[in-house]
Amino acid sequence: MLDFLKRFFGSSQERTLKKFQKLVDKVNLYDEMLAPLSDEELRNKTAELKKRYQDGESLDDMLPEAYAVVKNVCRRLTGTPVEVSGYHQNWDMVPYDVQVLGAIAMHKGFITEMQTGEGKTLTAVMPLYLNALTGKPVHLVTVNDYLAQRDCEWVGSILRWLGLTTGVLISGSPLEKRKDIYRCDVVYGTASEFGFDYLRDNSIATSVDEQVGRGFYFAIIDEVDSILIDEARTPLIISGPGEKHNPVYFELKDKVADLVQLQRELCNQLALEARRGLELFLDMDILPKDKKVIEAISEFCRSLWLVSKGMPLNRVLRRVREHPDLRAMIDKWDTYYHAEQNKEESIEKLSQLYIIVDEHNNDFELTDRGMQQWVDKAGGSAEDFVMMDMGHEYALIDGDDTLSPTEKINRKIAISEEDTRRKARAHGLRQLLRAHLLMERDVDYIVRNDQIVIIDEHTGRPQPGRRFSEGLHQAIEAKEHVTIRKESQTFATVTLQNFFRLYEKLAGMTGTAITESKEFKEIYNLYVLQVPTFKECLRVDHNDEFYMTEREKYHAIVKEIARIHAVGNPILIGTESVEVSEKLSRILRQNRIEHTVLNAKNHAQEAEIIAAAGKLGAVTVATNMAGRGTDIKLDEEAVVVGGLHVIGTSRHQSRRIDRQLRGRCARLGDPGSAKFFLSFEDRLMRLFASPKLNALIRHFRPPEGEAMSDPMFNKLIETAQKRVEARNYTIRKHTLEYDDVMNRQRQTIYAFRNDVIRSEDIFGLAKEAISHVALMIASLIVSRDHPTGNSLPRLEEWMNYSFPLQLNIEELKRLKSIDAIAERVADDLIEVFQNKFASMVQEITEAAGEKVDANGVCKDVIRSVMIMHIDEQWKIHLVDMDLLRSEVGLRTVGQKDPLIEFKHESFLLFESLIRDIRIAIVKHLFRLELTMTREQRPQNVVPVVATSFQNNENFGPLELTVISDSDDE
């Protein structure tokens, strides 16, 4: 029925394209009408359109005319020189109808999927121009600084011709110039720069003048799938150095290395014993039918199954798995031990290992033997694996009648410190093991200049300045014997998911989005529209070639390169990691094939390498870096011989990455071809291929070196990729559910902080905080049942200790109700506060004269105190939330939903945060001290007021130094 309706009415995509095509026709009609106008008259259209918007006309109504203005300008500029990134070129672009259609979709809030070379950059100019007419902030978000700079210089010239201002925001943009950049009508920049400025404005800036942003109205995200999906789980973090080194990594690094080496030796021994037993059978196409022989082979395969749980990448294991029947036996043991009825036997077998490595879920677990080895041989402690039950420990202390109250407090402090030490040690141990077992050099990171540099798993690009969180970076530094740097302290953080949801309107463009359309809709409420190509794509997509082993695969790849290279086609070989790119480069050198390598280690030459990759006979080996944001332009000779030939050395876990690699060839009507080579040892095949595929391998086992190629295999691979994508989507959605809790708290705190920065009535905010604290303390101390009893002296004692306030106990007793008492205390505190600051204003005026705005000085002091304590308490809260997030997963043991528990406890933490902020502010305000310093100044110099905070931990005193230009000594 659904198929019938689609045939009758057309699909949703077809209906949308048809509707937008009507607007395209209107744009072309306006374009013809604008042709007779002079350049000056066309420029004046911008002011006219702005006026019409201010008078109430909607952007949707103005769209056809505004887009026609941009199109007409592009036509008029044809042949004029434009400088882009230091290169001189002539303008030669006028938007095609499909580009206008894509531009309409972006304004309507769609993600437009446009193929490589179809002109996404020019397409974006039209919605940028239209939305900039509002005068509100309009941003174009790119994946790197180079593209931001290029696009601003290149297509930004259209906007500047029309009288709009453009700015570019890159990592080197000085802070003092950023405010001017944000004032531009259209700003180009990277996601991280926009995000970090948002965090700086809300966590570091202490005045309106220091804040650079002006809001979030409309953004177009280039390569939107990379930013909103691949980078979604990577938070933007502003941090500073921690107070001290965590000594755990120094203490444990050698011990952990020894334990991992023991595991390696054990697995190597098991693997070699199995190899000796299976030596005779490795070269047999068909195993013997003898029952006893099969049983013996099966036992050796059982040992190799155990090796797969301790060292998944063991060389002997990989060699044996090349044989389809032996591979099937190992997999059979895996199925056997996963069965519920064999769980005890599985536990007993796995207990032979020191560590169980779960490659599928990227996790590991220490066995009892591993823990014992840690204690006996590695010099560890059994306490490293036992966390303290603080409730039980505190109950024991409280129940010990031999201890005095002071001794009980000291004992609890000691217990708490011991618990903190154990947790830090256990966390450090786990991160060191993770670094050794799950993080691979030249895959997850590279070592450069005594530093660990992260490699982006999706783009293959190095990420200098980024650090793995939660101590993992320090653990890798310890593993690689580079300088272990201090752990950083987080000042502010936000995920890209929640940052981009700040915009009123959001759109995107990419060449690969349709496979993730469900996620875009559910998380960002963005629909994907596939825009038709201007010219038919001439790419030839060959079926994947499957080989049994990695060795056979690389041999076939080299043969393919040699064959194509002989014809002269430029070749781009895509690899999944730095390690693989360097391995393939060695093989090509051995075969004397000239080539260029592009990976995270030489990314600085990217533009130069890509510029040469389309020349006749060029061979380029690249990681995923070459898959996005780069157009490989062919020279004329390369077009004649058939264009760029793309070779994929494996399938990525995401179909989008494969599509990006294919999309490097056959751009804008050029010829080209693409082919992927796979082996059954590839990670995707090993971990996610279906049992059905393994059965087919055994049945169709080809001779050595011969490929298997069939559309059916392609389908099975796509199924495996969909399975991985679904899992990753679930993880991202799960992460967002937790971050949404944090996001609501972040927005509340940032709103409060901005109120403090911008408020003209800062005294009113301070009095509000004082009132809250007084009401809270009175409510906590004074007994609700007997408000006139013994609790009033305790309230008086606390007030005398915390504030210079003498309470009239007799008067409070006459008030009877706790609410009335709390209100009276609040009123008394506010009166003391007002008198204190009135006195300070008078002293400043007497000391500095009328030239100093004494009232303004006091307001600035109050503002500074409030901001300081908001920031300090927020930093502590971020640490508490991280700890809660890491611990809450254990609640599943008690049959509790971790997310519900997280929401509940984070709410309690947030209530505590608000309370602590108010108490800290109020205590500090009442402990301010004024120190007057007079210095001789020239008569014309305006007095300078400097403030410094001392003893912040004790909330004071704050020293206010007034430097006067008075002649008095």
Swiss-Prot record:
Electron transport keyword on record: no
UniProt cross-references to Gene3D superfamilies, sorted A to Z: Helical scaffold and wing domains of SecA (1.10.3060.10), P-loop containing nucleotide triphosphate hydrolases (3.40.50.300), SecA, preprotein cross-linking domain (3.90.1440.10)
Residues engaged in binding ATP: 99, 117-121, 631
Topology within the bilayer: Peripheral membrane protein
TM annotation in the entry: none
Location of the protein in the cell: Cell inner membrane; Cytoplasm
Catalytic activity: ATP + H2O + cellular proteinSide 1 = ADP + phosphate + cellular proteinSide 2
Origin: domain of life: Bacteria
EC numbers, comma separated: 7.4.2.8
Recorded GO CC terms: cell envelope Sec protein transport complex; cytosol; plasma membrane
Alphabetically ordered keywords of this record: ATP-binding, Cell inner membrane, Cell membrane, Cytoplasm, Membrane, Nucleotide-binding, Protein transport, Translocase, Translocation, Transport
GO BP of this protein: intracellular protein transmembrane transport; protein import; protein targeting; protein transport by the Sec complex
Family membership noted in the UniProt record: Belongs to the SecA family.
Function: Part of the Sec protein translocase complex. Interacts with the SecYEG preprotein conducting channel. Has a central role in coupling the hydrolysis of ATP to the transfer of proteins into and across the cell membrane, serving as an ATP-driven molecular motor driving the stepwise translocation of polypeptide chains across the membrane.
HAMAP family membership: SecA
Subunit architecture: Monomer and homodimer. Part of the essential Sec protein translocation apparatus which comprises SecA, SecYEG and auxiliary proteins SecDF. Other proteins may also be involved.
Protein name: Protein translocase subunit SecA
Gene name tied to this protein: secA
